[in-house]
Amino acid sequence: MGSSKSKPKDPSQRRCSLEPPDSTHHGGFPASQTPNKTAAPDTHRTPSRSFGTVATEPKLFGGFNTSDTVTSPQRAGALAGGVTTFVALYDYESRTETDLSFKKGERLQIVNNTEGDWWLAHSLTTGQTGYIPSNYVAPSDSIQAEEWYFGKITRRESERLLLNPENPRGTFLVRESETTKGAYCLSVSDFDNAKGLNVKHYKIRKLDSGGFYITSRTQFSSLQQLVAYYSKHADGLCHRLTNVCPTSKPQTQGLAKDAWEIPRESLRLEVKLGQGCFGEVWMGTWNGTTRVAIKTLKPGTMSPEAFLQEAQVMKKLRHEKLVQLYAVVSEEPIYIVTEYMSKGSLLDFLKGEMGKYLRLPQLVDMAAQIASGMAYVERMNYVHRDLRAANILVGENLVCKVADFGLARLIEDNEYTARQGAKFPIKWTAPEAALYGRFTIKSDVWSFGILLTELTTKGRVPYPGMGNGEVLDRVERGYRMPCPPECPESLHDLMCQCWRRDPEERPTFEYLQAQLLPACVLEVAE
């Protein structure tokens, strides 16, 4: 991916301002420049493709006008048809006395699967019995048990995994097709000097007789046979299949069975990662076994009763692009225990050493991940209230996840609840939310537009040179930030859609996610 060269324009023509023409603007950005297209040595290589200009209902970044289906990347299937023998997809080390350790490939007899995310299982290898995470296993002799089968992961996630520059040509996975029910898709990494590393997708169709094929001249009775054949012969594919796409273990749903309100003594705070107005963030260990992130809140920040009630809702929000809430210590000082993200906050990541290597394709991809998580929040009728780069966390391979959703409304600090106090993030907040307290998913959309400027400026504070009071006044009178340097006009226009005065005229996160799809992926038969 890359950006298109913008025609020289007067900077005033690059703004989506609603101010009168004679208004004085502060902190304007210079006109767009062509970004450096040299990919960083430790980031995904992507072919250079141009960003199109905006038209009515545009496909800004090579995407569709409808979003990808977002599903959890769990590969394990539920018990069906009386199947009780499962195979382990990953290694698992027990975290409590009631857990069962097992190795990848181990066969397990499910004793009782009515326990939600944790099933009681008996190992046919060790003879031991205990609870296991249900998303770490799949029915024996099923397609889900194949290492190359990734199930309902999105097309976008398959591309992110395959575009790792360490993957050799021909690295592949099989997933469910998002466009045709009952069909599958073979996704394969390819490379050439003109396009660089790219991904090709081949639809696997199903015969009425039960067989499978990519081209009708070569048919197979099973997906396993299809994969075995194309591992030996390219036969029309971009390359023969070489390596199964590597992937990391999924997060378990919770720390363990019945581990929600946990004792403070079960947590060890080890490395302080950051500090804010309302508390600290630590890397730590739960129960001496499990790496976690721990957010400690200063006493008085919020009511423990209100927090626990909100946390019950938050823990039900599960999506691959949301930081998972694992457990809580509900007595003051409140502790919030979540999955650990190794690269810290997006804001620090952008401003740090790695930020200088990020190019526009990676930044757009990160924006798309955030939009994906927020599209789920949107579907769940939830509101974040504090969406900004400081509340996005980064993991390995530039994975981004939305954090701290819903906590903002519980804060009781006067400097925050006044909405114009020193601690309130006024520069990220929609006018109707800042002035009248009307926080909705549409005010989150406004904040996402501001977050896009943080991405494209590598963490620069929005509205440079302006104080909070001036920002609120100018925005209310129609001012909108101009296009940042090296940002394509099409992306700036997307920001401006997020900053429309009428909240109902702002786009949905589903729409934003679709517009931010990568232009680096080549379409083949899907």
Swiss-Prot record:
Q: Which chain positions have N-myristoyl glycine-type lipid attachment?
A: G2
- Catalytic activity, per the record? L-tyrosyl-[protein] + ATP = O-phospho-L-tyrosyl-[protein] + ADP + H(+)
InterPro entries given for it? Kinase-like_dom_sf, Non-receptor_tyrosine_kinases, Prot_kinase_dom, Protein_kinase_ATP_BS, Ser-Thr/Tyr_kinase_cat_dom, SH2, SH2_dom_sf, SH3-like_dom_sf
Q: Where is this region: Disordered?
A: 1-57
Q: What class of enzyme is it?
A: transferase
* SMART domains associated with the record: SH2 (SM00252), SH3 (SM00326), TyrKc (SM00219)
Keyword terms: ATP-binding, Kinase, Lipoprotein, Myristate, Nucleotide-binding, Oncogene, Phosphoprotein, SH2 domain, SH3 domain, Transferase, Tyrosine-protein kinase
Q: Which residues are annotated as active site?
A: D386 (proton acceptor)
Query: Which residue range or ranges hold the Protein kinase domain?
Result: 267-517
Domain (SH3): give its ranges: 81-142
Q: Where is the SH2 domain?
A: 148-245
Q: Which residue windows does the record flag with biased composition (Basic and acidic residues)?
A: 7-25
Q: Name one Pfam family in it.
A: PK_Tyr_Ser-Thr
Any one Gene Ontology MF annotation carried by this entry is: ATP binding
Q: Where does ATP bind?
A: L273, G274, Q275, G276, C277, F278, G279, E280, V281, K295
Task: Give a short account of its post-translational modification.
Answer: The phosphorylated form is termed pp60v-src.
PROSITE patterns for the chain: PROTEIN_KINASE_ATP, PROTEIN_KINASE_DOM, PROTEIN_KINASE_TYR, SH2, SH3
Q: Which domain of life is it from?
A: Viruses
PTM-bearing positions, type Phosphotyrosine: Y416
- What EC designation does it have? 2.7.10.2
Q: Which family does it belong to?
A: Belongs to the protein kinase superfamily. Tyr protein kinase family. SRC subfamily.
Q: What does the UniProt record say this protein does?
A: This phosphoprotein, required for both the initiation and the maintenance of neoplastic transformation, is a protein kinase that catalyzes the phosphorylation of tyrosine residues in vitro.
Name of this chain's protein: Tyrosine-protein kinase transforming protein Src
What organism does the record attribute this protein to?
Avian sarcoma virus (strain rASV1441)
